């Protein structure tokens, strides 16, 4: 398998599938933080220890197949170009921290990109499983099975009283971070999100932007995750998050219907204006593109737009990010060059989708 696939394909195989409640929940993710005995944690380890850990995982897991996920490939951060690392961040396959601050970092990626094992990030390894739509329980089951498989080859740092030991005290215990990516345009438009976020925080959950801590909720996409990892089982943590997410889904759907009733043609106009911008613009910044894609996605969900699939918007959401644009261009681009390239790419992709739809109708 060539590494090029990871950098040149915007939509991972798992993301092209429709999951439950995928009109609102883009993806579910389970991440497990683990450390290996006999090695100091990444906050204290030497460069020699870091390289030994990478060598251990390369020797043990690289090029091995795992179930339906396919074969693992090891990517070392030191061997990747800055644009390539940015692409992996934009696809949510690695964290910004691994890309930018881990000189001895690496990542094991499965062929279908459903599984990512980050090495030498904040912990020795961070196991990540991604599923489309609202599938937290399924993602947890997959991550737990993978965790057991890995533990058959390495010894984890574990304390009978505390649980799994991690670099950051907030991860001690289960080492589990469960999260969902949600598209919540109606809650933003009605400003209900301003009331909902503090309420969610009080329940021990965290609301972040598209790329996690410190990032902005571009295109009305929010990441909701647990904060507590100690004193609860993995199943309870996931069940609690699932309950809150279901409530958010119900609130978003109710807000959408309220907007249809109160705004009517104005909401439809907003959707088609955004579609018009995307289909005809010659220059567009990433923030405006994300907002227009959000409006069009809402229009598809409400039945206003019928000739575009939601999958195309998932693709454009990633294709229009700075890293991917530069990967497509074959090198670094100035911001103004990226804006021109982004506009051209969106126009071209929407025209292709319209042609595909017309050909399908003719048949």
UniProtKB/Swiss-Prot annotation:
SUPFAM superfamilies: Glutamine synthetase/guanido kinase
Keyword Nucleotide-binding: yes
A Pfam family: ATP-gua_Ptrans
A biological-process GO annotation: phosphocreatine biosynthetic process
EC number of this enzyme: 2.7.14.1
Keywords from the named record: Allosteric enzyme, ATP-binding, Kinase, Nucleotide-binding, Transferase
Regulation: Appears to be allosterically activated by the binding of pArg-containing polypeptides to the pArg-binding pocket localized in the C-terminal domain of McsB.
Domain Phosphagen kinase C-terminal: 24-255
GO molecular function terms attached to this record: ATP binding; creatine kinase activity; protein kinase activity
Cited InterPro entries: Arg_Kinase (IPR023660), ATP-guanido_PTrfase (IPR000749), ATP-guanido_PTrfase_AS (IPR022415), ATP-guanido_PTrfase_cat (IPR022414), Gln_synth/guanido_kin_cat_dom (IPR014746)
The keyword Protein transport is assigned to this record: no
UniProt superkingdom: Bacteria
Residue interval(s) of motif RDXXRA motif of the pArg binding pocket involved in allosteric regulation: 338-343
Binding site for ATP: 27-31, 92, 126, 177-181, 208-213
Protein family (similarity comment): Belongs to the ATP:guanido phosphotransferase family.
Xref: NCBIfam families: PRK01059.1-4 (NF002194), PRK01059.1-5 (NF002195)
Protein name: Protein-arginine kinase
Record organism: Geobacillus kaustophilus (strain HTA426)
Lineage, opening ranks: Bacteria, Bacillati, Bacillota, Bacilli, Bacillales
